[in-house]
Amino acid sequence: MSTAAPFEPSRSDRRAVWLLVGLSLVFAIVPDNFSLGTVGIDANHTIMQGSGLRQIQYGSLFLWAAFLAWRHLSVTLSTLRAANPFLLLVVAYCLMTALWSPYPDITIKRSIIMIGLVLIGVAVAPPVGAPRQFLRAVMISYTAIMVVSFFVALLAPSVGVDTQLGNAWRGITWQKNMLGSISGFAAMLWLREFLIRPRKSVAAALLFSLFMLVMAKSATAILVTGLGTGVYLLTRHRLMGGRHAGVMVLLSALLGCLYALLFFYVAAGRMPNVSDVVGPVTALFNKSSDLTGRGIIWDLVEVAIDQHRVWGIGYSAFWVGEGGPAQYIANRIGWMPGHAHNGFLDILVDMGEVGMGLFLACLVWHAGSLMRLFRIDREDAAMHLGICVTILISNFSESQILRDTSFQNIMFIYSSLAISGRLVQARRARLS
């Protein structure tokens, strides 16, 4: 039996966690060039290509995280050893693709950002951060952005309202879908707070989040928020007894998917494609099955995937703007997208089947870690699961996962490492 004293973080450590999580998300969501009037294509390219200010912002956070990790080196190493190994392999493979990337400088820069985000995630994971501090930091950060966006939309509609998209609100974010997405995550997190502590102020924050979600007029955000919230509500209470209940639910869901796949194959004589999967759902929102014209982009991206099927073209080396590998897409559709509008296609074009295999293994490991967390803190595990489902589903129409400073990618990395930290804490508690 261990007699080592439990780790006790200082007040400054906890403040550092709030700031590292909050600022890294704010920097990802709020434009870095202060040109809030920019919409559409130009904004997308600023997001994807980065800027000197963005490098200073995240470089400062990475140095701060490195200092925090060094201060608590033994805790950092314990969390790192318990981390999802396939997440670390994905990041390592991102860097490795610089060997054949047509733009190795871009690949290396973006890979360094991924490494830095992992460093922040390790530095702020429990026990340095409180068990639920990461999710509360996300909630407060998104709420602050929504409050500022609310006043900007009312007082400066030329900046905060997108007149080209039905007067949808975008506030101080890049575009309406981003405001809708963070409003959805905030609504989920405030709902959890209300279920734990049903107070009027919490209810008001929840209603405000839902109001901002509606005003953003993002059907995708509304859909995935509803699905993620449903997963959270269904799993936060034990539906069946036994220590293997979570595994049984997971296997039952997998079996249901396999039966649905078999039924479709027997009925249609082929495997389902993206349109078959998303069509019935998007029809509820009067959207086409290719999610408003994204289908032509997907078809064109698949041409590049076929050319670099195994290893990929190189991490973040495809969507590099005019004259890059994606130029043929711009020539066909008349404008240059910033991404494929499908995160999974972007993984394939950047990192090939090897990278996709590592990412799928990362998800399987993440699911296993969640099952273990359910035995320790069911409430927290249910929310992490709901967030994961929301991120994965939304990436069928937006490219966020594994896209360096995309805020959903940041959330996924931090969530994975926060879970690892919780599991390390639980193991130490059993041994003490």
Could you describe each region identified by the protein language model?
Residues 99-108, 214-215, 397-403:
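Membrane-interface helix caps and helix-loop-helix hairpins in membrane proteins
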Residues 282-299, 303-307, 311-351:
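Long extracytoplasmic/lumenal interhelical loops at the membrane interface
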Residues 61-65, 91-96, 133-164, 173-238, ...:
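Alpha-helical transmembrane segments of multi-pass inner-membrane proteins
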Residues 126, 200-201, 253, 350-392, ...:
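Hydrophobic transmembrane alpha-helices and their immediate junctions
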Residues 1-95, 126-140, 193-200, 243-247, ...:
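Transmembrane signal-anchor hairpin modules in multi-pass inner-membrane enzymes, especially those
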Residues 48-68, 108-120, 178-187, 223-230, ...:
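Membrane-embedded alpha-helical segments of multi-pass membrane proteins
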Residues 381-432:
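Transmembrane alpha-helices of multi-pass inner-membrane enzymes
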Residues 151-156, 233-285, 302-307, 315:
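A membrane-periplasm/extracellular boundary helix in multi-pass inner-membrane enzymes
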